[in-house]
């Protein structure tokens, strides 16, 4: 699929009160940058904009997620004999993409990106630390051996602080950003995606991602208006 040469430009948003809103920055880590173990298309292009948004301190709360896998994680192609990265298998009755080894705990590629001022972050959610289960969403793990998607605790943390609206950005737009936004909407949060502050694994993922966001009632927001 060819990416549209004229990508969606969300309308500029009127000034809004963000004191009851949370910014959720998904997996801004070196292994997802160009040259990294699981590079996202133009992943480094969003770093300055996310840094500016965090420095603006417009949001009542800021959460970052961090992919944090143990060696030998079930999502790694290297954990399955004869399998290659980006192949799909069935795991616990659900489709599972097999990934290159990435974001292994306590390795440089798993760190939060050094080009961002993280001082405004209130909480960091580490995902994928269970060796048996992948974890795309900030809110729930993927399906595990019991056939359920255990919560990460983020939804309760946000509700305890009066948050009813979330803005999601980061990597990858067609995987962890999408799953996080979908879960946020299903859990009752008014949900926005900062499209220009996300990038996909490959541009081929953009059209189905747009369709999924629209289907689930998730809005696109203008990042420039939020950092002004």
Predicted regions and their residues:
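Short glycine-enriched, charge-decorated loop/helix-capping segments at active-site entrances
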Residues: 36-43, 138-144
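Active-site flanking residues adjacent to catalytic metal/cofactor-binding acidic residues
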Residues: 26, 66, 195
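Short, flexible loop segments at boundaries between secondary-structure elements
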Residues: 193-206
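Active-site alpha/beta core segments
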Residues: 48-165
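Structural recognition of alpha->loop->beta junctions
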Residues: 117-120, 204-228
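Glycine-rich anion-binding loop/nest that anchors nucleotide
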Residues: 163-176, 195-198
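Short, hydrophobic/glycine-enriched beta-strand segments
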Residues: 21-27, 32
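Histidine-anchored nucleotide/phosphate-binding helix
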Residues: 53, 175-186
């Amino acid at each position: 699929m060819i990416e549209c040469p004229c990508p969606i430009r969300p309308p500029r948003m009127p000034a809004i009160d963000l004191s009851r809103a949370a910014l959720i920055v998904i997996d801004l880590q070196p292994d997802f940058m160009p040259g990294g173990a699981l590079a996202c298309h133009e992943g480094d292009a969003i770093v300055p904009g996310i840094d500016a948004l965090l420095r603006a301190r417009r949001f009542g709360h800021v959460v970052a997620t961090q992919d944090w896998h143990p060696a030998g994680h079930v999502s790694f192609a290297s954990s399955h004999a004869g399998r290659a990265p980006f192949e799909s298998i069935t795991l616990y009755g659900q489709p599972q993409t097999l990934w290159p080894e990435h974001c292994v705990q306590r390795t440089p590629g798993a760190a939060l990106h050094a080009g961002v001022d993280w001082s405004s972050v209130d909480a960091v959610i580490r995902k994928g630390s269970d060796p048996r289960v992948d974890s795309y969403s900030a809110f729930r793990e993927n399906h595990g051996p019991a056939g359920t998607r255990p919560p990460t605790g983020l939804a309760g943390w946000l509700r305890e602080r009066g948050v009813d609206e979330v803005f999601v950005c980061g990597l990858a737009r067609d995987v962890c950003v999408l799953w996080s936004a979908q879960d946020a909407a299903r859990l009752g949060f008014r949900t926005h995606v900062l499209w220009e502050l996300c990038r996909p694994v490959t541009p081929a993922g953009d059209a189905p991602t747009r369709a999924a966001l629209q289907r689930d009632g998730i809005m696109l927001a203008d990042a420039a208006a939020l950092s002004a």
